[in-house]
Amino acid sequence: MSAVVQREALLKKIDEALKSGKKRRFRQSVELIVVLRGIDLSKPENRINLLVELPHPPKLNKIAAFAHGAFETQAKNAGVDAVITRQEVEGLAGNKRAIRKLAKQYDFFIAPPDLMPLLGRVIGPIFGPRGKMPEVVPPNVDVKTVVERLRRVVRVRLRNEPVIKVRVGAEGQKPEEILTNILAVLEELNRKFPLRQYLRDIYIKKTMSPPVRIKPAEVLAR
């Protein structure tokens, strides 16, 4: 990625964003906003929904497992924050309020393949549009490894507008840590949409601070 992005130039912009705005009484997040151009989002192949693992996540995600049988035991041993059983899923049927609450309560979900038809019927209409459908864990995959990865990921989505918004840090983190997080996101994005061709602007901002605009010419290597 260093061949595409000038690290030092981007690091200066991160430092500028961290110093901007007033002090707040809470720990502000640092957000990355990427604006793309020349992408026809009416074509399904141009919409993306990626999970990118951050080298220095600002917080660890909360993970819940839809589970039963051996998978339930594996999920508990992997240290998930909650287990929702088959019976509990069946009890959610038709209860949109409870399903919405569940979707907000956890960052990511996992499930075994055999539960997916039930989950598709019960939670799919609400979880699907929110990008919260469970990650399917095949029988031969170590559940703990999946959970540990999901603790550190952010979701990168491109759907109706050519704009991506991702939390890449928080106040108190070193600028270099936030830089490596941003580079991880940009690297994945560059694989799908080469930045030299499709990047319009980058913005970095804290939760309550004005964004720092970064033009492609300022950070893309020549």
UniProtKB/Swiss-Prot annotation:
Keyword set, alphabetical order: Repressor, Ribonucleoprotein, Ribosomal protein, RNA-binding, rRNA-binding, Translation regulation, tRNA-binding
InterPro entries: Ribosomal_uL1 (IPR002143), Ribosomal_uL1-like (IPR023674), Ribosomal_uL1/biogenesis (IPR028364), Ribosomal_uL1_3-a/b-sand (IPR016095), Ribosomal_uL1_arc (IPR023669), Ribosomal_uL1_CS (IPR023673)
A GO BP entry: translation
Gene Ontology CC: large ribosomal subunit
GO molecular function: rRNA binding; structural constituent of ribosome; tRNA binding
UniProt family annotation: Belongs to the universal ribosomal protein uL1 family.
Known partners and oligomeric status: Part of the 50S ribosomal subunit.
Role, per record: Binds directly to 23S rRNA. Probably involved in E site tRNA release.
Xref: HAMAP family: Ribosomal_uL1_A
Protein name: Large ribosomal subunit protein uL1
Species annotation: Pyrobaculum calidifontis (strain DSM 21063 / JCM 11548 / VA1)
Higher taxonomy: Archaea, Thermoproteota, Thermoprotei, Thermoproteales, Thermoproteaceae
